[in-house]
């Protein structure tokens, strides 16, 4: 199968014609062109534009020495290179940048494949296992054979036998299990003779007789004194008691019996959570698992992730109006309402949820006051009335304001300081005028 690969730096493109022309040889690595287009796969660096591979080719680099344990023999005096790699043995270096091999698999809880390759149990480098010898790794576990058609026939036969039986409650019926247990041979092929029960001084076949005595006098009045024999006679199990038990609807009062399972072995054991859940295991692989090595090489993003740049921004955060405001927002361009980079200059007065200032410490401003207030005023009514008992803080602030007072005109020129005593007076003269009577 011919695959056309373009040499564009940073991208890989596979033609659809080569994919659909024939079957894929490797089933585990199918090429899903439509699925790969939906994924946000990072760019693959080619030979021209290397990505993090140049450091392996540097001389005297530990990663280079591990990748090439012995220098090529074509180099002159290759055995004199320093540092010389160690010889082959138990301390032979691993693959480049593979020193931190985890021994345990975080998914299954057993030994990871990297730990098996590092320890080499067959060569002699073994460690004591942390699990029982009966435990088997998931990749080495043999599935339980399914009996198939024979199990289906057996279940149908048992079901037909149960349907033919009378499932109503019968107190006189003796179960087959009880009869087989009495006769023996339930757990052994030989017939077991049950032992005779020993009774001390009494027998089950003993018949009790009661003398019929008169229960009433000759005049027809019942006897007052009770007889113990009558009480003992009434406590015996009689046919009337049996009939009373049969009239009780036990089938409606008692739950149905539980059918025992054929085996106690779990179908799919989970060594991590130790729970049994059939919905967790799916026989059909997901689409993301069928991508192959590209899925393991690059961690993809979720399909539901928002694609940047984001072209929508809430207009209420920029117009400074309350949320869900459906009124008119004035702007230079109407398209800037949905544009995150647009300029919205609202010319209308903004709405505030902050209430107006109220002061209930004064006599005239009691709650429910309906005095006259100007329609443009934001202060409460009669707020200019001074308080009856000024606090010391107000006197202190008043002194500070008097000391920090600054001239309103701030004229410091010589002509501004002149004082004219005739009309028109100097407007900057702030001396008090005195009237003299002749």
From Swiss-Prot:
Pfam families (UniProt xref)? SPATA48
Provide a GO biological process annotation. spermatogenesis
The entry's keywords: Differentiation, Spermatogenesis
Superkingdom classification of source: Eukaryota
What tissues contain this protein? Testis-specific.
* Factors inducing expression: Down-regulated expression in testicular samples of azoospermic men.
* Function description: Essential for normal spermatogenesis.
What is the protein name for this chain? Protein SPMIP7
User: Source species, please?
Assistant: Homo sapiens
Q: Which gene encodes it?
A: SPMIP7
């Amino acid at each position: 199968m011919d695959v056309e690969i373009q040499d564009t730096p940073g991208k890989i493109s596979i033609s659809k014609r080569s994919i659909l022309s024939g079957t894929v040889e490797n089933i585990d690595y199918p090429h899903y062109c439509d699925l790969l287009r939906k994924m946000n796969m990072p760019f693959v660096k080619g030979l021209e534009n290397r990505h993090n591979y140049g450091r392996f080719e540097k001389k005297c680099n530990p990663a280079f020495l591990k990748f090439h344990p012995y220098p090529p023999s074509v180099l002159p005096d290759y055995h004199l290179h320093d540092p010389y790699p160690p010889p082959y043995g138990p301390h032979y270096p691993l693959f480049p940048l593979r020193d931190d091999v985890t021994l345990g698999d975080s998914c299954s809880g057993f030994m990871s494949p990297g730990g098996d390759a590092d320890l080499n149990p067959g060569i002699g480098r073994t460690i004591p296992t942390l699990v029982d010898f009966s435990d088997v790794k998931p990749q080495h576990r043999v599935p339980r054979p399914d009996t198939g058609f024979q199990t289906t026939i057996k279940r149908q036969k048992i079901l037909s036998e149960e349907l033919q039986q009378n499932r109503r409650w019968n107190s006189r019926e003796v179960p087959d299990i009880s009869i087989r247990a009495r006769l023996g041979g339930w757990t052994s092929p030989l017939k077991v003779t049950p032992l005779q029960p020993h009774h001390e001084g009494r027998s089950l076949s003993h018949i009790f007789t009661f003398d019929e005595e008169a229960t009433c006098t000759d005049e027809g009045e019942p006897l007052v004194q009770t007889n113990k024999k009558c009480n003992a006679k009434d406590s015996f199990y009689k046919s009337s008691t049996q009939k009373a038990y049969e009239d009780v609807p036990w089938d409606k009062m008692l739950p149905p019996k539980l059918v025992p399972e054929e085996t106690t072995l779990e179908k799919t054991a989970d060594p991590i959570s130790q729970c049994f859940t059939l919905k967790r295991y799916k026989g059909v692989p997901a689409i993301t698992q069928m991508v192959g090595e590209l899925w393991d090489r690059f961690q993809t993003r979720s399909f539901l992730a928002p694609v940047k740049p984001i072209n929508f921004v809430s207009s209420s955060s920029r117009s400074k109006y309350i949320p869900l405001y459906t009124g008119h927002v004035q702007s230079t361009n109407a398209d800037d309402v949905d544009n995150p980079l647009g300029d919205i200059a609202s010319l209308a007065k903004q709405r505030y949820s902050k209430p107006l200032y109220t002061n209930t410490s004064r006599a005239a401003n009691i709650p429910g006051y309906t005095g006259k207030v100007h329609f443009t005023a934001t202060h409460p009514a009669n707020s200019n009335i001074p308080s009856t008992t000024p606090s010391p803080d107000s006197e202190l602030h008043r002194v500070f304001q008097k000391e920090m007072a600054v001239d309103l005109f701030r004229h410091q020129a010589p002509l501004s300081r002149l004082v004219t005593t005739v009309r028109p007076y100097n407007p900057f003269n702030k001396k008090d005028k005195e009237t003299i009577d002749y």
